[in-house]
Amino acid sequence: MADEEVQALVVDNGSGMCKAGFAGDDAPRAVFPSIVGRPRHQGVMVGMGQKDSYVGDEAQSKRGILTLKYPIEHGIVTNWDDMEKIWHHTFYNELRVAPEEHPVLLTEAPLNPKANREKMTQIMFETFNTPAMYVGIQAVLSLYASGRTTGIVLDSGDGVTHTVPIYEGYALPHAILRLDLAGRDLTDYLMKILTERGYSFTTTAEREIVRDIKEKLCYVALDFEQEMATAASSSSLEKSYELPDGQVITIGNERFRCPEALFQPSFLGMESAGVHETTFNSIMKCDVDIRKDLYANTVLSGGTTMFPGIADRMQKEITALAPSTMKIKIVAPPERKYSVWIGGSILASLSTFQQMWISKQEYDESGPGIVHRKCF
């Protein structure tokens, strides 16, 4: 470990996308979908080199002949064989490194079950023979990336949304809340409301198109009712989008109705509180003495917080819920889509962090349980 030139690898495994690269870099080298595809039928063309599984972009492009699986659901790994394939692809195909030569920092969802952390640790040391590894909580890494050690992180990705209060670098588990409403649900909802407008999007290929429409054209309204009125009375909010086949579609109030579901989950038929209320509830579960620090350091993280207008709307909604004298600050770093990875990159390259790695030797002596003693 004394060798300065050995770069650590940082891998952030999200439900939708896997972000991977080298510690010390300011952005991940590889970003690809967290999917594993297996051929639906036995290959007819013998000797055509048909593989028994495909990962990431290759699985995406061959999806017509494959059955696609997402090994990470709602932020938690549910299929370890496929997860191993994703890690293998990350090291050997994307980063082109030998994992036995680099320490590896992995990320995990808040409240990840203990058995899961142990399994990650075991696979890294036993399957990939890494010299050292560490598991960091995603929201905590995002907070580090924003230059803070205290604050509350609203982390919303493709599969799950969490509100995570953090005090002096430690997540407060009793106050973490999870909302099973994230990017994938918003894409599905946009597919549904575009269908109501007369456009049909149903296949997985079409879902990707809708995801692109969502990312390019959707925004969060500051005042939903007022925005609906504006949309009804004029065409100023309408935008057009060209489909791959050249057809041009027009999208109006769908642009802000789609992400409004984050604030009003009832749009999706869910009874849960919206992201603003969930953030407030999380803060209220914390000790009264630290709430002020959380309100003033509310950090947005993850791809689903990338909608224009979301920070202003959060500011407005939380101001309405909080005590009237409270100073509220919503922090929305421009690179927040990758802030978990960036936080991992920063952490793994700190000189003070080097004693925090779990080494192969420690693992051999203590077994997978070592992860609970060294990563918290």
Curated annotation (Swiss-Prot):
It catalyses: ATP + H2O = ADP + phosphate + H(+). Keywords: ATP-binding, Cytoplasm, Cytoskeleton, Hydrolase, Nucleotide-binding. Its EC number is 3.6.4.-. PROSITE patterns: ACTINS_1, ACTINS_2, ACTINS_ACT_LIKE. One of its GO terms (cellular component) is cytoskeleton. The keyword Nucleotide-binding applies. It comes from the Eukaryota. SMART domains: ACTIN. It is found in: Cytoplasm, Cytoskeleton. The keyword ATP-binding applies. InterPro entries: Actin (IPR004000), Actin/actin-like_CS (IPR020902), Actin_CS (IPR004001), ATPase_NBD (IPR043129). One of its GO terms (molecular function) is ATP binding. Actins are highly conserved proteins that are involved in various types of cell motility and are ubiquitously expressed in all eukaryotic cells. PANTHER family: ACTIN. Belongs to the actin family. This is Actin-2.
